[in-house]
Design a protein with these regions (language model features):
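Conserved P-loop NTPase
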Residues: 722-778
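P-loop NTPase motor domains
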Residues: 53, 60-79, 90, 253, ...
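Extended, folded cores of ATP/NTP-driven motor/assembly subunits in large transport
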Residues: 1-404
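Hydrophobic anchor at the beta1->P-loop junction of P-loop NTPases
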Residues: 441
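Post-Walker A helix-loop "phosphate-sensing" segment adjacent to the P-loop in P-loop NTPases
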Residues: 459-469
């Protein structure tokens, strides 16, 4: 036997003690709060949790890259210990799940909509498999003291973080309480919310930590066990196929059942492995030589070497090539799996399903006989390996047992954004957890952009007290906002609602001189007035006059408006100033004076929609700029009060028609983030945006991007900008309404978002022709 394996078997060997209590079944001796467990004589373990990556929807090239990176991770495992990779399938606790996602009633006249929204969420949660898949790496080592173990695990932590980061996954240490919670949730399924453990309190009272996690009873039979009122069974992989597909683990763990699958890996030093293979190869060559000698003695000089001896020679040489030329490592592996059910009948049916999946992959799984307790302790992420059925493998062979499948997004306190198109689990996004909350909604007309935005608005209106501000160029949001108790501000030539383009609250700008910031904004407005734009002289005049208007206001002058600014132009001597006064006359004293009056809009309502449908083409871009500036003022006021603001800007591409308005929006985008505002830009003209360097930078720097069905040129540009694979592009090619891809931080997840059509909320949110009678009634 190889020295490494012999040593590990010797170190793992323990005196068998018949357990006299359920606590004694749990093979843990000592725990520390940082997550290190002592599970045997000088044997310490530590568990790490890692996140999933999009392996199932990756392109062939990307899959190969991920496979090689995962193989590098396996090769990095230390020979001095053993490593266990565990996939934990657990069903979400119904009570905790509902408490986390449902909106509480508030008796404010909107509970009717809350009930509809909650019913939709419950229907989605019931139809999905409600399973959470968690993935762990448990590293074991043999050290004399806890200090030595801590030093060892510190080095392992650094290596694991580095390798998982290259895979696109995140790896984090599991502390003592969380590791006990994993075991508690397995041992006491259905009682997840009842877990409470404080190590200091437990030590003070002299209680064993096992009392907090163990089930009420354990009964081990020949080929199954009972754990409390649940049944369980442990299987192991007895026979491996010659070629295993990389989706076998994904299929085994795709069952809608509580189960844990563990792969134990024992790496062997390369020099030992080469020595062992040379010894085996020498033995095969000796057998072939002896066989040939016997044939020659019988005067049979042309005999062909028997097939089995030829195969042994070929396989030994291939193994040697793997070790010496292909940077493979020899590893010993064992795959175990424990699954539980509510009845023996259900358990038997689930076992047969798992055995069938194995047979389909040409692998043979077997039930452990009279070893169910040892198998259970091997399958759990504790660090034990009590099943000796190890198989000799290479790094490549172990890497085929790929634990990755698809990324899930299920943040506490998140907004429902649809269902994962692959796993069918709910997608719950909490933008607070992202590096920045900036969002984009992109898609062709009819793909479901407005509906997606309205779903977010509904949740925010019903579940939070945050302010919601919407810029509505197509009058699509008014009926919904009024139903939610909000206010509609109609901005148009001749309208009674006015927004002063020169309003400026205390704290306006990026922290510099607010008058200079406002002057830049006024310059961007004047760029809209003439297709030729404004020249350097005119910019100087505008800058000077804006400064004078605000200076006079501080000394008791008139409230700054565009009319006051025009009068200031008329006072100047330069002919360019007179030209500016003439150009601005239409927008200050003429028929397009919507932004030249003092503001008379009530800003106390927390939900406001700015309806700019009737502004006309000449004022549309100016309207977007002025409303965004007004939103900035509101955001600044809310920020001072510690209040969050959500902003929705439709037809976003319009503002990038010239350099100044684009620069203003880029600046506003940064200020929103700094002042606790969550902006969302909505547009159908993706190609137009991506042609602007500023806009494409804004998109690439945004952490939350919803991509619905895209036109061909838009798809290609988005794929380049956001590194989307060909397979993932399929989810935004000829996609149904409400279906696509969501980029959430570093995750890229395909989703489907379908809302029940027989609800009041659907009628308020839809813009589909024939179903939008409420919105058409406002036109």
């Amino acid at each position: 036997m190889i020295k490494t394996l012999s040593n590990i078997f010797k170190q793992d060997k323990e005196k068998f003690v018949i357990p006299r209590s359920v606590q004694q079944v749990i093979p843990i001796e000592t725990i520390w709060s940082d997550g290190i467990f002592k599970i045997g004589r000088n044997k310490f373990t530590r568990t790490y949790k890692f996140t999933d990556i999009n392996y199932a929807v990756a392109s062939k090239v990307d899959k190969e890259t991920m496979f090689l990176e995962y193989m590098d991770l396996l090769n990095s495992f230390d020979c001095g210990g053993t490593t266990k990779i565990t996939i934990n399938n657990r069903r979400l606790n119904k009570v905790d799940f509902e408490k986390a996602i449902l909106i509480p009633m508030q008796e404010d006249g909107l509970d009717l909509y809350r009930k509809e929204y909650n019913n939709m969420l419950l229907d989605k949660a019931t139809s999905s498999n409600s399973m959470v898949q968690e993935k762990y790496v448990t590293v074991s080592c043999y050290k004399k003291t806890i200090e030595e173990a801590r030093t060892y695990f510190a080095r392992v932590t650094t290596e694991l973080n580095s390798h998982f980061a290259r895979l696109g996954s995140k790896c984090a240490e599991v502390n003592g309480e969380d590791k006990l919670r994993i075991l508690h949730d397995f041992y006491r399924t259905g009682e997840e919310s009842g877990f409470h453990f404080d190590i200091q309190e437990s030590m003070r009272k002299g209680h064993s930590f096992k009392d907090y996690i163990c089930p009420d009873t354990f009964e081990f039979e020949k080929d199954y066990f009972r754990m409390g009122d649940r049944y369980g069974r442990v299987l192991f992989l007895r026979e491996y196929a010659s070629y295993i597909k990389d989706d076998m683990i994904a299929e085994l763990t795709n069952m809608n059942r509580n189960l844990m699958l563990s792969i134990d890996v024992i790496p062997v030093p390369t020099d030992e492995a080469v020595q062992e293979v040379e010894k085996r190869l020498l033995g095969v060559e000796t057998n072939i030589t002896n066989w040939q000698r016997r044939q020659n003695a019988n005067n049979n000089f042309s005999a062909v070497i028997p097939y089995d001896l030829e195969q042994q020679r070929k396989e030994s040489k291939e193994f040697m090539d793997d070790l010496t030329t292909r940077d493979q490592r020899m590893m010993f592996g064992v795959l175990t799996m424990v699954h539980t059910a509510e009845s023996k009948k259900q358990l038997d049916a689930d076992t047969e399903t798992l055995l069938t999946i194995g047979r389909k992959k040409l692998c043979q799984f077997s039930v452990l006989k009279f070893q169910q307790m040892d198998g259970l302790n091997t399958a759990l992420p504790i660090g034990h390996r009590k099943i000796p059925a190890v198989r000799t493998l290479t790094s490549e062979s172990v890497a085929v047992l790929m634990p990755f499948r698809v990324q899930e997004i299920m943040d506490a306190g998140g907004i429902y954004c649809g269902e994962n198109a692959i796993s069918h689990n709910l997608i719950m996004c909490n933008k607070e957890k992202l590096l920045n909350p900036n969002s984009f909604l992109l898609g062709v007309p009819g793909s479901g952009k407005s509906f997606n935005a309205k779903m977010q608005i509904v949740f925010l209106a019903l579940a939070t007290q945050d302010d919601i501000l919407i810029c509505d160029p197509e009058r699509e949001y008014a009926s919904l906002v009024e139903a939610m108790g909000g206010e509609v501000v109609r901005i148009a030539a001749g309208s009674r609602d006015h927004i002063n383009a020169m309003d400026m609250v205390d704290g306006y700008g990026d922290g510099g001189d607010p008058v200079i910031e406002k002057s830049q904004f006024i310059l961007s407005l004047f760029e809209q007035l003439d297709k030729k734009g404004i020249n350097a002289k005119e910019r100087s005049i505008i800058d000077r006059c804006v400064g004078e208007v605000y200076e006079e206001y501080q000394h008791g002058g008139a409230v700054p408006t565009l009319r006051v600014l025009r009068e200031k132009f008329l006072e100047q001597e330069e002919p360019e100033a007179q030209d500016l006064a003439l150009v601005s006359e239409l927008f200050t004293n003429g028929s397009l004076d919507a932004f030249a009056h003092e503001s008379n809009v009530d800003v106390n309502n927390r939900i406001m929609v700015y309806d700019i449908l009737d502004l006309g083409k000449q004022l549309k871009t100016m309207g977007l700029l002025v409303i965004t500036d007004a939103m900035l003022n509101r955001v600044t006021e809310n920020w001072k009060q510690g209040k969050r603001t959500h902003i929705f800007l439709d037809e976003f591409h319009v503002v990038f028609e010239n350099e100044y308005s684009g620069a203003f929006f880029n600046s506003a985008w940064r200020r929103f983030r700094k002042r606790n505002a969550f902006p969302t830009a909505i547009t159908q003209n993706v190609e137009y945006l991506l042609d602007s360097v500023l806009a494409s930078t804004m998109i690439s720097n945004s952490e939350y991007i919803v991509m619905l069905n895209q036109a061909e040129p838009d798809r290609a540009k988005l794929a380049t900008l956001l590194n989307i694979s060909t397979e993932q592009m399929g989810y935004i090619t000829n996609a149904d309404a409400g279906c696509g891809l969501v980029k959430y931080g570093s995750s890229l997840v395909p989703f489907a978002n379908r809302f029940p059509t027989n609800t009041r909320l659907y009628k308020l949110m839809t813009t589909k022709p024939g179903e939008d009678s409420i919105n058409r009634g406002r036109m």
